[in-house]
Structure formats: structure tokens, C-alpha cells
A protein has these predicted regions:
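N-terminal cap/lid subdomain of alpha/beta-hydrolase-fold enzymes
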Residues: 1-51
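Short, flexible loop/turn elements at secondary-structure junctions
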Residues: 2-5, 33, 77-78, 101-104
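Loop/turn elements at helix/coil->beta-strand transitions in domains of secreted/extracellular proteins
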Residues: 22-26, 68-70, 92-95
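A structural signal for short, well-ordered beta-strand segments and their strand-loop junctions
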Residues: 28, 73-74, 96-99
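Alpha/beta-hydrolase active-site loop
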Residues: 45-66
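Alpha/beta-hydrolase fold nucleophile elbow
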Residues: 67-77
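Glycine-rich nucleophile elbow surrounding the catalytic serine of serine-hydrolase chemistry
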Residues: 75-85
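Alpha/beta-hydrolase
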Residues: 85-178
């Protein structure tokens, strides 16, 4: 289950961790209202957790005829949320649910992330991470060409300027690491 757009899964070299480990087939489902799954006209009334669960239920029922063995639902971030919601609405559809990350936010400002980041790991590890982040920001003018070159070589594109991409990478590093 993908929580966002699924275009990257079209890459012939793409492999998802569980399907690789289990030598399993992969049915990759793009979340409604993202990329190619955006209807015209956009009627936001249909963008609900229940409808997304029904989407997965219908996909699973269709493919279960072809793939009758065990089923796993997995996802990261919004995909993790989708995995949990799918299990909540259709508890018997899949044999296993593996939400790698599934943040269920309490509101626009959740408040749980900061205390987590202040306690995770050891104090020395947290200090090393913060020192690294500060060092990268101090050397931003040197780091930016390296990031631009890397992104160009990997054909990565963004909707924001590259200096902002670097800022996000640095500021989100501790959260992404843990």
C-alpha cells in the first residue's frame, strides 16, 4: 500500500523489502488523489480513509483469484497509515500487516516528535547527530554543489529549490535516522 504516488514502483529495478525477502509477488497500489489516481473533476468528498481501505479491498479481491496464497499489506509513512486503516476496516483481508512507519497524528500540531527526539538513542549519539547537522549547515555553500551533482546523476528532481532540499535533508535527518 502506497500512501502517495506510485510512479517510482514502475522502475524495473524497484524492489520492495518484504517481497524481496520472501520472494513474493508485489501489487503496488497508488493512493487515490495522487498522480495518475487523481480524478477530474476533483471531488474531495471521496478522499476518505474508508474509501482508501475499500480500494485496497477491491484490489485484493480481484487479484486473490490470481494469487491465492498469503497476503501482506505494508507501507511507509502515509503508506503505513494506510496499512493500519486497511487492517481496521478489513481485518481478514490480509495475513500480515507491516506498517514500517505509521504516524497517526492527533492534530496539525501533534507534539510527540520533539520529546521522542530528545530521548531516543544516547545523549552522546544525539549530540553527534546535532553536531553533524550544524556542520553541514555551516558548510552549506560547499555541500550544495555535491547534492546537486548527486541528484543530477540519480535523475532526482524536486518542486522546491535545491537549497531548500538541503535544508530539509539536514533538519529531518535525526527524525529519519531514528
Amino acid at each position: 500500500t502506497e500512501g502517495y504516488g506510485a510512479a517510482y514502483a514502475l522502475n524495473p529495478k524497484y524492489q520492495e523489502e518484504l517481497s524481496k525477502l520472501l520472494n513474493a509477488n508485489l501489487v503496488f497500489v497508488e493512493y487515490r488523489y495522487f498522480l495518475e489516481s487523481t480524478p477530474e473533476p476533483k471531488n474531495w468528498d471521496y478522499l476518505t480513509a474508508e474509501n482508501s481501505a475499500y480500494d485496497l479491498h477491491n484490489v485484493r479481491n480481484t487479484f486473490k483469484q490470481i494469487y491465492p496464497e498469503k497476503w501482506i499489506s505494508t507501507g511507509i509513512s502515509k503508506g503505513g497509515q494506510t496499512t493500519m486503516l486497511y487492517r481496521a476496516f478489513f481485518p481478514d483481508d490480509v495475513d500480515f500487516s507491516v506498517p514500517y512507519v505509521g504516524p497517526l497524528c492527533k492534530g496539525v500540531e501533534d507534539g510527540r516528535h520533539e520529546p521522542f527526539l530528545r530521548k531516543v538513542g544516547t545523549k552522546a549519539e544525539r549530540e553527534k547527530i546535532q553536531d553533524f547537522q550544524l556542520e553541514v549547515l555551516k558548510r552549506k555553500s560547499d555541500m550544495l554543489p555535491l547534492l546537486e551533482s548527486y541528484c543530477k546523476n540519480k535523475n532526482l528532481t524536486f518542486r522546491i529549490p535545491m537549497p531548500e532540499v538541503l535544508d530539509y535533508c539536514v533538519l529531518e535527518y535525526s527524525f529519519a535516522l531514528w
